[in-house]
């Protein structure tokens, strides 16, 4: 009987130790691995693109076209989106400085009531940009879509991309992966209290970008026939 009790105790102890190891793996090593993977992807995206991002308009490279990445015009019915305003302001600065001759505004037009490219065009025209110097891409549902379509649909080999500073590395990373000679210029920063969640999401979005281009081979939502941009001023 004593022998049986000892055997049961040993068996129980082995199972308990196994459970402890499993719990330790789940609680510590798996989350640690995820954190390290997220960090590695972010370092890759940022580290491989920083040299292609201009410090200001003066140092920005001259290109025929600037790609302005879309966002919503408002964040609430009576509250303007500062990301929207600042991106267009920077695009206007590039245009007026002679750094670009044409603006490609790319964004979400998922419903008849939501049209980022049209909102961007209307705002830019009100800011003094000639309408003939603006092309709309109505299928820029994601950053990947906008970058790939700039290359494949609008037949651009080189482009200056305008968006928020935290967003630029991902845009440049995706564009250059698909053979687009991309340089970036950051719009003026939005106060962190109004953009904190967006900054946090970007850490995971960079991971998704790495997976999209190097593992999943994710295509844009919509393709189409080539529509080369004819630059005139």
Language-model-detected regions and their locations in the chain:
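Short linear elements at protein peripheries
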Residues: 63, 217-233
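A structural signal for short, hydrophobic/glycine-enriched beta-strand patches
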Residues: 3, 7-11, 41-200
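Hydrophobic membrane-insertion alpha-helices, especially the h-region
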Residues: 24-42
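Residue-level signature of transmembrane alpha-helical entry/exit and packing/kink sites
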Residues: 21-26, 194, 198
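Enrichment for repetitive, rod-forming helical segments
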Residues: 32, 94, 213-215
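A transmembrane-helix-recognition feature enriched in membrane-embedded lipid enzymes
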Residues: 199-218
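Cytosolic-side transmembrane helix boundary signature
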Residues: 5-24
């Amino acid at each position: 009987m004593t022998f049986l009790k000892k055997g049961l105790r040993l068996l129980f102890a082995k199972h308990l130790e196994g459970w402890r190891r499993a719990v330790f793996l789940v609680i510590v090593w798996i989350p640690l691995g995820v954190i390290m993977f997220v960090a590695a992807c972010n370092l890759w995206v940022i580290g491989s693109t920083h040299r292609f991002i201009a410090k200001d308009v003066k140092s920005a490279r001259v290109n025929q076209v600037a790609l302005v990445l879309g966002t919503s015009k408002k964040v609430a019915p009576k509250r303007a989106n500062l990301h929207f305003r600042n991106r267009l302001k920077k695009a206007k600065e590039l245009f007026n400085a002679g750094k670009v001759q044409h603006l490609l505004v790319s964004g979400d037009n998922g419903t008849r009531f939501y049209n980022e490219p049209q909102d961007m065009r209307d705002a830019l025209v009100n800011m003094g940009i000639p309408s003939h110097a603006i092309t709309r891409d109505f299928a820029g549902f994601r950053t990947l879509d906008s970058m790939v379509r700039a290359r494949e649909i609008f037949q651009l080999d080189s482009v200056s991309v305008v968006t928020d500073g935290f967003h630029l590395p991902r845009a440049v990373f995706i564009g250059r992966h698909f053979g687009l000679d991309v340089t970036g210029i950051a719009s003026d920063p939005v106060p962190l209290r109004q953009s904190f969640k967006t900054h946090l999401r970007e850490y995971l979005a960079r991971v998704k970008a790495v997976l999209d281009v190097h593992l999943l081979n994710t295509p844009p939502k919509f393709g189409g026939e080539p529509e080369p941009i004819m630059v005139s001023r």
